[in-house]
Curated annotation (Swiss-Prot):
Zn(2+) 2 binds at C886, C962, C969, C972. Mg(2+) binds at D535, D537, D539. This is DNA-directed RNA polymerase subunit beta'. SUPFAM superfamilies: beta and beta-prime subunits of DNA dependent RNA-polymerase. DNA-dependent RNA polymerase catalyzes the transcription of DNA into RNA using the four ribonucleoside triphosphates as substrates. Keywords: DNA-directed RNA polymerase, Magnesium, Metal-binding, Nucleotidyltransferase, Transcription, Transferase, Zinc. It comes from Streptomyces griseus subsp. griseus (strain JCM 4626 / CBS 651.72 / NBRC 13350 / KCC S-0626 / ISP 5235). Belongs to the RNA polymerase beta' chain family. Its cofactor is Mg(2+); Zn(2+). Binds 1 Mg(2+) ion per subunit.
């Protein structure tokens, strides 16, 4: 077998019959599979051991040779080689065909490659292949031209003879008629009889004339056909062809079926055809030129590669190894077999029958029919259903052909190559483990024992508890006590991976240190639930075990949950206290707010003293008291120290200080690092998020992880101590509700009366009622808010951000308000009741639609979102950080601050997702002084400093302007949002971008919303809008943009409306037909700029690219995608969207080819285009010109240079057909291609720069070695870990944290 690590490219091409024979280990001659009595393969059949190898290891068919000592011997009795049975997965056979057949992919694919090469229409090609027309394969032009006069004379003579014969026959008949008439007259016959005789004779003479004319016409037709006969002419009239062959058979040759194409392909002159096509392209126009371009692509594909066109017609068919199309016995003696075996049997049966007919010398019509059936059998084998009705098996199910084996989710690519089932894995239900540390998980003992079995057995032998592995295995199976002691030892510091499906982003798989627990459920740390999107209502998780030392190191350093605190989408913490923890910490940090609570206004010398008072029940947690804090505690931000009294020293930072706060807040601050500023406010979810974000920005991971664990423990503790419960009595309906509703009911009646009197229209009534009841609902909500006491448990939950929101509370305690109907229109009758009061039957009924629609939408969204993620991953999978700096000086100008109405500079709203975590492209200079140098990371601190210095705009590096040939560079990408440091070389940023965009996809709403009102246009929003943008589709109701600077004129007729732009430079006017309902953004006579939007709606990205250029379309797409995500409150960094858009704009359409080896209209990679142009310019030629092409993500994925990646994505057969014709070579740059062939992916630690490291001493060490006198003089200190950089392990040191 081939070792995957020893090749760098994989090429696909067309196999000729000789290639197929060299792969084969023998010819399959019989359709038999296995003998039903002996269950052994039949000789020369589809499972023959002689061809494919033995069914049992080291054993021949007849049993003469058994055991491994006969390895390699070929049995002289049965002819089977003694070897391993697994060769039956590799060895191929072949079927020698009695007549050639065409490969259906090349004839029936769109476009038909055979048709393009031979310049034949697909339907004509089909006529030839399926024996409905003859094709002329050879004409002896020279001889025909030479003999034409003599042949013409011969034909003329024949024509003359026919005419003479006709004339003499007519004359004879006329004479006979005369004599007959004379006899009749003599006999005195009546006139009637004479007339009949005359008519009969005339009829006969007419037949003679017609027959002669037909013969002459046929002769003329045959002659004219022969005169103009040329190669590749088709003749569907069999009689005409036969006559042609009988008369002039020595001058031409023709036949039917694949044999005709084979002959034609053998004599086809590719060079001459290419030259002819280039001439047409140079001189031709329109349709002719387009077709010539398409044909030239196919012709030049054969010219530039080692492919032979005759490879598209097969003389023999390969038979794949039998273990890939197995036959298994079922209970009851029946057999289940792969569909391929049935398809192969059809081919063999028909082939054998054709051979027999040919041997018998059967008539041509019978032979042709059999050949056609053979062609159809091979078509079905290669791609069943591509032409005509598919071959079906039992129950009318179409059989799965070779093409179907590759296609789709169940095909070879996606089922077996990109996703495999793995061993050393387990699965169980998850429960919460509140006692765990952040980097730990609880693993059931039984599961751990099974997973770590080999490790435990080895350790048992090492410790002499067992003599050998066999007895160790027995000990483990019997569950001896010592086994569990050894298990504890084995799992120490051996991380395991936990995964929850669906794995929507990289945080769906994280590493943990296992802790053995009783029971059968896996225990999960509560803080990682957000990342996994897990809850404990029956969710299951899978456990995987990293085996090798490298795998364990990667799991510990890169995947340990405490190293994955930040979310890769926006660089903000994802490991956040939620729900109970938030409620507990909120309870802990609220103050009394004027309520009379125990112990208020007292003073304490320390937190410990105050805690004693609390334990003695003399002090409330929320009471405002004075507490003195020890040395080293940081006061709150913005705290002003009290004025020192005489004789007392001034306050210095780090001194002890006194603060008016609550005991709860003092306890909360003990959870945070000592040098963190004192938090003196109520901490809800939002505040907690800011604190954790601040911690992640400023402290090492170890401290952050420890602090998070402290917050978790305290949160649960105080949530329990708070005694927060929910009862129906906590839902307080505001007393003012009745009066509010009554007032609005009166307004409602007034509107109804106006409508009844005809003062307002139906639409106006609906609009007014909706406005009235929306106002009413809001007023009830305000009354309810005012009505809730701060200590109400439900209000506390919402106020802290632990669970629920005001809208849900309004529905429970206030009123439900307006709901929509099935058409998505708001029903103007509100639901006046709340859930606490209970709904009437009608109210309940009209509210059901919304609830059901919500569920249906969620189901649809999940599938659509998953498909979007798959396409995004596919388009961006080869974007990897390849180098540190590409050296570009280009970048994006981005706003970081805007001046408010008060003239104060404030950070822009989107600074988090646009500027944060990027690199500066140039120095930031204020008043001639550099305040931030280029290539510095823009973190929160630096952005605040720049805004403080009055900077409004900065130029940053971006992947859109990166000049790396493949992938992108670290400086243009900036900070890795998942680690908070500059991105490492080898990081697969493309996949992270795809996950970051795809993961929140399920949260985006589905459907188009009906805006209602005057315009009534449907606007696409949510997930469909994101798909529309990434697929670069023309949006529905597209808004036109001005192509030139000028003025607008509006032309309106009864049916149409047009916007006409008159350019200032006097060039031609541009007219934009628009809908009568479209809302205009410009008025009559208004000036417009280039690229200005003229109506309300979405613009077409292709127009933006054409008119405003590449940069504008990039900005437009990023902005539009962000709009959708922002509307749902999802935060994604711009750089992720930019990576996808960079991939969409990776290709150039060639306009003029110049001297470059590129065809006009061809789509090429930008890097290939630039390289080719550089080559042409250095050789003094004319470079090619092209324009950037915006491609949708599906199209861009399929157009990738890697055929393996494209084939495993979509349209597998089309991609493989194209790749084979072009003999494409896959240089294995992306991730997918390497996963498919089983190589390490070229990302992360799989990059060659990390794998091919040679450890060498430094120059200083060598010098020290040479000058060393004795052993003690040698200084080994500079050696480090070889020449690579050492990993700062203190970052991952959990020594003190584990205790």
């Amino acid at each position: 077998m081939l070792d995957v690590n020893f090749f760098d490219e994989l090429r696909i091409g067309l196999a000729t019959a000789d290639d197929i024979r060299t792969w084969s280990h023998g010819e399959v001659k019989k359709p038999e599979t296995i003998n039903y009595r002996t269950l052994k393969p039949e000789k020369d059949g589809l499972f023959c051991e002689k061809i494919f190898g033995p069914t049992r290891d080291w054993e021949c068919y007849c049993g003469k040779y058994k055991r491994v000592r006969f390895k390699g011997i070929i049995c002289e009795r049965c002819g089977v080689e003694v070897t391993r049975a697994k060769v039956r997965r590799e060895r191929m056979g072949h079927i020698e065909l009695a007549a050639p057949v065409t490969h259906i992919w090349y004839f029936k694919g769109v476009p038909s490659r055979l048709g393009y090469l031979l310049d034949l229409a697909p339907k004509d090609l089909e006529k030839v292949i399926y024996f409905a027309a003859y094709m002329i394969t050879f004409v002896d032009e020279e001889r025909r031209t030479r003999d034409l006069p003599s042949l013409e004379a011969h034909v003329s003579v024949e024509r003359q003879q026919t005419e003479n014969r006709r004339d003499s026959d007519l004359e004879a008949r006329a004479k006979k008629l005369e004599t007959d008439l004379a006899e009749l007259e003599a006999e005195g016959a009546k006139a009637d009889v004479r007339r009949k005789v005359r008519e009969g004779a005339e009829r006969e003479m007419k037949q003679l004339r017609d027959r002669a004319q037909r013969e002459i016409d046929r002769l003329d037709e045959v002659w004219s056909r022969f005169k103009n006969l040329k190669v590749q002419d088709l003749e569907g009239d069999e009689l005409l062809y036969r006559e042609l062959r009988d008369r002039f058979g020595t001058y031409f040759d023709g036949c039917m079926g694949a044999a005709a194409l084979q002959k034609r392909l053998e004599s086809f002159d590719l060079d001459e055809e290419a030259e002819r096509l280039r001439e047409i392209i140079r001189t031709g126009k329109g349709q002719k030129k387009t077709r010539a371009l398409k044909r030239l692509k196919v012709v030049s594909a054969f010219l530039q590669t080692s492919n032979k066109p005759k490879g598209m017609v097969l003389d023999c068919v390969p038979v794949i190894p039998p273990d890939l199309r197995p036959m298994v016995q079922l209970d009851g003696g029946r057999f289940a077999t792969s569909d391929l075996n049935d398809l192969y049997r059809r081919v063999i049966n028909r082939n054998n029958r054709l051979k027999r007919l040919l041997d018998l010398g059967a008539p041509e019509i019978i032979v042709n029919n059999e050949k056609r059936m053979l062609q159809e059998a091979v078509d079905a084998l290669f791609d069943n259903g591509r032409r005509g009705r598919p071959v079906t098996g039992p129950g009318n199910r179409p059989l799965k052909s070779l093409s179907d084996m590759l296609k789709g989710k169940q095909g070879r690519f996606r089922q077996n190559l990109l996703g495999k089932r793995v061993d050393y894995s387990a699965r169980s239900v998850i429960v919460v483990g509140p006692q765990l540390k952040l980097h730990q998980c609880g693993l059931p003992k039984a599961m751990a024992l099974e997973l770590f079995k080999p490790f435990v057995m080895k350790r048992l032998v090492d410790l002499n508890h067992a003599q050998n592995i066999k007895s160790a295995k027995r000990m483990v199976e019997r569950g001896r006590t010592v086994v569990y002691d050894v298990l504890e030892e084995v799992i120490a510091e051996h991380p395991v991976l936990l995964n929850r499906a669906p794995t929507l982003h990289r945080l769906g798989i994280q590493a943990f240190e296992p802790q053995l627990v009783e029971g059968k459920a896996i225990q999960i740390h509560p803080l990682v639930c957000t990342a996994f999107n897990a809850d404990f209502d029956g969710d299951q998780m899978a456990v995987h075990l990293p085996l090798s030392a490298e795998a364990q190191a990667e799991a510990r350093i890169l995947m340990l949950s405490s190293n994955n605190i930040l979310k890769p989408a926006d660089g903000r913490p994802v490991t956040m206290p939620t729900q109970d923890m938030v409620l507990g910490l909120f309870f802990l940090t609220t103050d009394d707010e004027g309520r009379n609570v125990k112990g208020a206004d007292r003073a304490f010398g320390s937190t410990a003293e105050a805690t004693m008072a609390f334990d003695a029940r003399e002090l409330s947690l929320q009471a405002k008291v004075d507490i003195r804090f020890p040395v080293g505690t940081m006061p709150p931000r913005g705290w002003v120290p009290p004025v020192a009294e005489e004789g007392e020293p001034e306050y210095q930072p780090g001194d002890t200080f006194r603060l008016r706060t609550t005991l709860g807040r003092a306890l909360f601050n003990e959870l945070l690092p000592e040098d963190y500023p004192f938090v003196d406010y109520s901490v809800g979810k939002k505040q907690l998020s800011e604190i954790v974000n601040d911690l992640a920005e400023r402290y090492p991971k170890v401290i952050v992880a420890a602090t998070l664990d402290n917050l978790k423990a305290a949160g649960f503790h105080w949530a329990t101590r708070s005694g927060v419960t929910v009862a129906i009595s906590d839902v307080v309906v505001p007393e003012a509700k009745k009066a509010i509703v009554k007032g609005y009911e009166e307004q409602d009646e007034k509107v109804q009366k106006q409508y009844e009197r005809g003062l307002i229209t139906k639409d106006e009534r609906t609009q007014e009622l909706i406005a009235i009841w929306t106002k009413a609902t809001n007023e009830v909500a305000e009354a309810m808010n005012a009505n809730f006491p701060k200590t109400n448990p439900i209000f506390m939950m919402v106020d802290s951000g632990a669970r629920g929101n005001m809208m849900q509370m309004r529905q429970i305690a206030g009123m439900r308000g307006l709901v929509s109907n099935a058409k998505n229109e708001t029903i103007p009758r509100p639901i006046k009741a709340s859930f606490r009061e209970g709904l009437t039957v009608l109210e309940y009924f009209i509210s059901t639609h919304g609830a059901r629609k919500g569920l249906a939408d969620t189901a649809l969204r999940t599938a659509d979102s998953g498909y979007l993620t798959r396409r995004l991953v596919d388009v961006s999978q080869d974007v990897i950080i390849r180098e540190e700096d590409c050296g570009t000086d280009r970048g994006l100008k981005l706003k970081i601050a805007v001046k408010g109405a008060d003239g104060v500079l404030r950070k822009t709203d989107d600074v988090e997702t646009s500027v944060y975590a990027r690199m500066l492209a140039e120095d930031v200079v204020v008043d001639g002084k550099v305040i931030a140098p280029a290539n510095v990371d823009l973190g929160d601190v630096l952005i605040d400093a720049l805004v403080g210095a009055g900077v409004e705009e900065v130029k940053t590096r971006s992947v859109l302007t990166c000049e790396s040939a493949v992938g992108t560079c670290a400086f243009c990408y900036g900070r890795s949002l998942a680690t908070g440091k500059l991105v490492d070389i080898g990081e697969a940023v493309g996949i992270i971008a795809a996950q970051s965009i795809g993961e929140p996809g399920t949260q985006l709403t589905m459907r188009t919303f009906h805006t209602g009102g005057v315009a009534g246009d449907d606007i696409t929003q949510g997930l469909p809008r994101v798909v529309e943008l990434f697929e670069a589709r023309t949006p529905k109701g597209v808004a036109p943009i001005s192509e030139a600077k000028g003025r607008v004129r509006i032309e309106e007729t009864e049916k149409t409306k047009k916007l006409v732009v008159t350019p200032d430079d006097g060039s031609d006017e541009t007219a934009f037909p628009i809908s009568k309902r479209a809302r205009l953004l410009v008025g009559e006579g208004d000036p417009v700029e280039v690229g200005q939007k003229l109506t309300v709606g979405a613009t077409n990205p292709h127009d933006v690219l054409r008119i405003l250029g590449q940069r504008a379309v990039q900005v437009h797409l990023v902005g539009e995608v962000q709009k959708v995500y922002n509307s749902q409150g999802v935060s994604i960094h711009d750089k992720h969207i930019e990576i996808i858009i960079r991939q969409m704009l990776r290709r150039v359409t060639i306009i003029e080819s110049g001297d470059a080896e590129l065809l006009p209209g061809e789509l090429v990679e930008r890097s290939k285009f630039e390289t080719e142009n550089r080559r042409v310019v250095t050789e003094g030629g004319h470079p090619a010109s092209g324009r950037p092409q915006l491609m949708g993500i599906t199209k861009a994925s399929l157009a990738t240079e890697s055929w393996l990646s494209a084939a495993s994505f979509q349209e597998t057969t089309r991609v493989l057909t194209d790749a084979a014709i072009n003999a494409k070579s896959d240089s294995l740059i992306g991730l997918k291609e390497n996963v498919i062939i089983g190589k390490l992916i070229p990302a992360g630690t799989g990059l060659s720069r990390y794998r091919n490291i040679r450890v060498e001493p430094t120059e200083e060490a060598k010098a020290a070695m040479y000058s060393a006198v004795g052993y003690d003089d040698i200084d080994y200190s500079p050696f480090g870990t070889g020449s690579g950089q050492a990993v700062p392990l203190e970052d991952y040191d959990y020594g003190p944290y584990n205790q």
